[in-house]
């Protein structure tokens, strides 16, 4: 293709969390977009990706807040392939000036926006559409013995999850 392939990288309020807007080239057939190019990402992502994951979730499913301990702490590049989510990252780096602060942003297949969550953050999302397929690249392989989580409704964090309908005793479905 003769057009430039570009990405816009926008730091969010926790500036280590980066919203990535890929250029979409549209025509009467649909669109074409790069979703990753190592040379474009190297300023923002200093580690190679070693594993790709895909999660399919129904409406209202809340996944997270997950993280993995060192030496296998994971950075994640999150992209929605179908549907919409509201994505959250929580700074869990004890030495960070933003320790225990969180940021949330919508991601959807329609916009193609992606989110970079570096190692040292817990990550989670809630599905805000009829369902969602979420793909993410990670910088360390999954190690179940190092897997940890934080409650989605931790009273100290006060995460403002979007209201997605009435919550039954079993809801949201958390994983």
For each of these PLM feature ranges, what is it?
Residues 3-113, 129-131, 138-175:
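Non-catalytic, conserved peripheral segments adjacent to functional cores
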Residues 121-123:
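Recognition helices and adjacent regulatory flanks at domain boundaries
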Residues 126:
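A short local structural element in Rossmann-fold oxidoreductases
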């Amino acid at each position: 293709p003769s057009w430039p392939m570009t990405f816009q990288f926008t730091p969010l309020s926790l500036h280590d969390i980066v919203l990535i807007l890929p250029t979409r080239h549209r025509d009467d057939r649909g669109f074409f977009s790069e979703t990753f190019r190592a040379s474009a990402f190297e300023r923002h992502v200093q580690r190679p990706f070693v594993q790709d994951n895909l999660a399919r979730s129904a409406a209202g499913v809340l996944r997270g807040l997950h993280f993995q301990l060192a030496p296998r702490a994971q950075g994640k590049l999150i992209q929605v392939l179908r549907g919409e989510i509201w994505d959250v990252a929580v700074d869990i780096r004890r030495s960070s000036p933003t320790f225990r602060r969180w940021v949330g942003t919508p991601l959807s297949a329609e916009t193609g926006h992606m989110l970079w969550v570096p190692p040292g953050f817990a990550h989670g999302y809630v599905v805000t559409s009829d369902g969602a397929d979420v793909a993410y690249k990670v910088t360390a392989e999954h190690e179940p013995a190092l897997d940890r989580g934080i409650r989605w409704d931790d009273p100290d964090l006060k995460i403002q999850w979007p209201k997605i309908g009435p919550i039954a005793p079993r809801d949201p479905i958390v994983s």
